[in-house]
């Protein structure tokens, strides 16, 4: 999906989901 890796499986970093 073009998003950088995230430490929590099934979740995306803020810059991808725009939610923190």
Swiss-Prot record:
One of its GO terms (molecular function) is acetylcholine receptor inhibitor activity. It is found in: Secreted. Its main location: secreted. Keywords: Acetylcholine receptor inhibiting toxin, Disulfide bond, Ion channel impairing toxin, Neurotoxin, Postsynaptic neurotoxin, Secreted, Toxin. Disulfide bonds join 3-16, 14-20. The cysteine framework is XIV (C-C-C-C). Alpha-conotoxins act on postsynaptic membranes, they bind to the nicotinic acetylcholine receptors (nAChR) and thus inhibit them. This is Alpha-conotoxin-like ts14a. It comes from Conus tessulatus.
């Amino acid at each position: 999906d073009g998003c950088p890796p995230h430490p929590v499986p099934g979740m995306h970093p803020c810059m991808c989901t725009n939610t923190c």
